[in-house]
């Protein structure tokens, strides 16, 4: 395990969320739900409350040299079974640089030290970059399922949709995408 002195994470606070407004934007219609669209103070406060007041959840910001470049979530924390659902969102300006993998290495080590035994996550089939990262970290694919596509309707005229057409299904004029559950056994595989 490498040490990354330029990368760190800590518990999220409201002041952190105001910096998310300065992040880049995903251009691909496949990833629009990852764009931080809240602009007003009221909307940002509501977003923070919505995320951090969920029971059995924890949120952390990702920092690179003190600049906030993303966040991590732990949801559905089960203290008895010592498992939780992992989420990660990066400022699009910091994607494809290996940062996601590096911060996840640090975060998974932290979770193991906290006594977590199993971490699971969900990834859309079309999010090949993320799936490759998770597999490199030792996550195993468990099963696939259909979910309502969160970013509008399928449009085969757009290259991102066309190149990933096997990831989508239209049912009763509604767009669904395939996603998968993946998990990592921290005791055995980390």
PLM regions and their residue ranges:
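Helix-loop element at the rim of GNAT/NAT acetyltransferase active sites that forms part
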Residues: 3, 22-38
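A short beta-loop-alpha structural element at the N-terminal edge
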Residues: 7-22
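Conserved acetyl-CoA-binding loop of GNAT-fold acetyltransferases
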Residues: 135-145
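C-terminal "cap" of GNAT-fold acetyltransferases
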Residues: 117, 147-190
């Amino acid at each position: 395990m490498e040490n990354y002195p330029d990368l760190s994470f800590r518990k999220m606070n409201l002041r952190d969320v105001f910096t998310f407004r300065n992040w880049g934007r995903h251009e691909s219609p496949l990833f629009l739900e990852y764009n931080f669209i809240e602009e007003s103070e009221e909307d940002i406060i509501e977003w923070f409350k919505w995320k951090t007041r969920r029971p059995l959840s924890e949120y952390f910001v990702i920092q690179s040299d003190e600049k906030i470049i993303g966040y991590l979530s732990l949801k559905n924390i089960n203290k008895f079974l010592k498992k939780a659902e992992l989420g990660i969102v990066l400022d699009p300006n910091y994607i494809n640089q290996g940062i996601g993998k590096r911060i996840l290495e640090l975060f998974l080590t932290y979770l193991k030290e906290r006594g977590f035994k199993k971490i699971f996550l969900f990834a859309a089939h079309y999010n090949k970059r993320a799936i490759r990262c998770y597999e490199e970290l030792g996550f195993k694919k468990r099963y696939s399922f259909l979910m309502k596509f969160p970013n509008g309707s399928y449009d085969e005229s757009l290259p991102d949709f066309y190149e990933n057409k096997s990831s989508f299904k239209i049912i009763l004029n509604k767009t669904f995408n395939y996603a998968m559950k993946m998990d990592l056994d921290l005791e055995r595989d980390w």
